[in-house]
Structures are given as structure tokens and as C-alpha cells.
Amino acid sequence: MIQSFTRLSVADNSGAKEIMCIKILGGSHRRYARVGDVIVASVKKAIPNGKVKKGQVVKAVVVRTKKEIHRENGSLVRFDDNAAVILDAKKEPIGTRIFGPVSREVRYANFMKIVSLAPEVL
């Protein structure tokens, strides 16, 4: 569960290393974001010569959370970190590679480009 001021690692090669959630999109007073939700975030750590810079405000989709995900078949899935992929204005990923596994819920949220770039979908 991601809320305001939560820091997430970035799971792509856009140049950002860490982002901080500012707002969760999809509702007027939405408190938490889960896997597949789009958030507005600020870049807190970035590498030099990257596509995004420190302090830039970006949109991102959550791909991994420490909080477990309950599936309809009764299974639970949880990850070791909170991670997101930075998006452009067309809701396509800015980076060309995805690092680490992504959750299957990203596919249900219609982010097929992220699913196709991911090395593993859990």
C-alpha cells in the first residue's frame, strides 16, 4: 500500500533511482495505491545524463509492493520492495528496460508494454 510521501525504487532505466509519491490518481481523496495504480511522484534520486532529473514531477505506475496482494485463487504475493515504472503523457514507459519482476495485476491495468518488457511476471 503506497500513500503520500512513500518512497519507491524505480524499476526502469529512465535515469531515476528513487521517487516519492505525491498523489494517488483515481478518486478525490484516495489514500492508498496498490499494484497497477498510477501515482504522481517527485524524483528524489537520479543518475547523471538520465531522461528524468532530480526534482522533476512525473507519473508512475506501481509494479511491486511489500504489502501482500490477495489473488482470487487464494494465493498471496508479496515483494521485497516498493517499486514503480515512470510513465510519459501517453501512459507508456519512459525507459526501455524493466528491472526485476512485476506483478500480474499490471497486465489487468492495461500496461501491456511494461509486461512485455519485464523479465518475469508473477
Swiss-Prot record:
Work out whether the entry's keyword set contains Ribonucleoprotein.
yes
Coiled-coil spans in chain? none
Which domain of life, per UniProt? Bacteria
Its family remark reads: Belongs to the universal ribosomal protein uL14 family.
A single Gene Ontology biological process assigned to it is:
translation
Q: Does the keyword rRNA-binding apply?
A: yes
Query: Could you tell me the keywords of this UniProt record?
Result: Ribonucleoprotein, Ribosomal protein, RNA-binding, rRNA-binding
Give GO cellular component annotations, separated by semicolons.
Answer: cytosolic large ribosomal subunit
PROSITE patterns membership: RIBOSOMAL_L14
Function, please?
Answer: Binds to 23S rRNA. Forms part of two intersubunit bridges in the 70S ribosome.
Designated name of the protein:
Large ribosomal subunit protein uL14
Per its UniProt record, what Pfam families does this chain match?
Ribosomal_L14 (PF00238)
State any single GO MF term: structural constituent of ribosome
Q: Which InterPro entries match?
A: Ribosomal_uL14, Ribosomal_uL14_bac-type, Ribosomal_uL14_CS, Ribosomal_uL14_sf
Q: Which PANTHER family match?
A: 50S/60S RIBOSOMAL PROTEIN L14/L23 (PTHR11761), LARGE RIBOSOMAL SUBUNIT PROTEIN UL14M (PTHR11761:SF3)
Cite the record's note on assembly. Answer: Part of the 50S ribosomal subunit. Forms a cluster with proteins L3 and L19. In the 70S ribosome, L14 and L19 interact and together make contacts with the 16S rRNA in bridges B5 and B8.
